[in-house]
């Protein structure tokens, strides 16, 4: 089995967890490859390991990716697996751990259970983003695990967000922005904006306006095979798109 190890934030504690995982894998004879940004934190042993680069598709021989950190790290790990379907095992070394599987105080036991194949796969929906005009920010990564959000940038005025579902006009939202959330993301920004909680296995997406002018504009749930086309207008020349 070949494991890719990923981390995004390097506190003393998280480095300790990474080293513990490395030692465990070495003791069990498993092959592994490390995210390149881990290298400078490993001291004298750093040159003895293999590394993979940021935003580059992982080797097809990788069986699993271990994301060591909190929920934010796990979300960022999507950028290195993209649509390769490599499973992610979350190891919590951060503050939040809603998406991670192995907790801090059960690290070794959790790894033992994993390599005994005492796990199950849970598939999560991703959102793919395409823009009419080329954007350098989306050159390497166009997928979102939690949500895609459109927000105001240089204005306090509302946005006019024209929304199409499968080429059929849905509505024009007058609001501060719009959240398109997956079931995974339904407990994040969308929830704090009045959206529903959706179970991870639900094959749907949530369309949720942020502070809409018309209070009758409530969140809408649509099938996850839906293609959304969104056109944004406002007093500002630019708007924010976040994944």
Report the location of each language-model feature.
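ATP/NTP phosphate-donor binding region
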Residues: 1-64, 105-120, 131-142
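Short glycine/serine/threonine-rich phosphate/pyrophosphate-binding segments
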Residues: 14-15, 72-77, 187-192
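Short gly/pro/ser/thr-enriched loop/turn and capping motifs at secondary-structure boundaries
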Residues: 41, 94-99, 197-198, 213-215
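Glycine-rich phosphate/dinucleotide-binding loop and adjoining beta-alpha-beta core of small-molecule
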Residues: 67-96, 101-104
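Catalytic core of DAGKc-family lipid kinases
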Residues: 95-176
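Structural signature of FAD isoalloxazine-binding scaffolds in flavoprotein oxidoreductases
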Residues: 115, 199-202, 207-212, 221-234
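ATP/nucleoside-binding phosphotransfer catalytic cores, i.e., glycine-rich phosphate-binding loops
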Residues: 137, 150, 166-169, 215-243
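Gly/Ser/Thr-rich active-site loops/lids in small-molecule metabolic enzymes
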Residues: 171-216
């Amino acid at each position: 089995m070949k494991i890719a190890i990923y981390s995004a934030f390097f506190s003393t504690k998280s480095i300790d967890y990474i080293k513990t995982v490395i030692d465990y894998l070495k003791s069990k004879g498993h092959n592994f490859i490390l995210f390149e940004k881990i290298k400078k934190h490993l001291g004298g042993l750093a040159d003895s390991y293999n590394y993979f680069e940021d935003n580059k598709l992982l080797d097809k021989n990788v069986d699993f990716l271990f994301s060591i950190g909190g929920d934010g790290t796990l979300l960022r790990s999507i950028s290195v697996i993209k649509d390769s379907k490599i499973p992610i095992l979350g190891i919590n070394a951060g503050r939040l751990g809603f998406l991670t599987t192995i907790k801090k105080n059960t690290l070794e036991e959790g790894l033992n259970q994993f390599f005994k194949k005492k796990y199950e796969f849970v598939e999560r929906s991703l959102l793919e983003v395409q823009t009419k005009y080329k954007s350098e920010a989306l050159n390497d990564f166009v997928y979102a695990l939690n949500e895609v959000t459109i927000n105001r940038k240089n204005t306090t005025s509302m946005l006019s967000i024209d929304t199409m579902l499968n080429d059929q006009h849905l509505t024009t939202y007058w609001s501060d922005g719009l959240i398109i959330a997956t079931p995974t993301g339904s407990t994040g920004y969308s929830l704090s904006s009045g959206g529903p909680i959706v179970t991870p296995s639900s094959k749907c997406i949530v369309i949720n306006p942020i502070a809409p002018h018309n209070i009758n504009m409530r969140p809408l749930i649509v099938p996850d095979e839906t293609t959304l086309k969104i056109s944004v207008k406002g007093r500002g020349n630019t708007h924010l798109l976040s994944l």
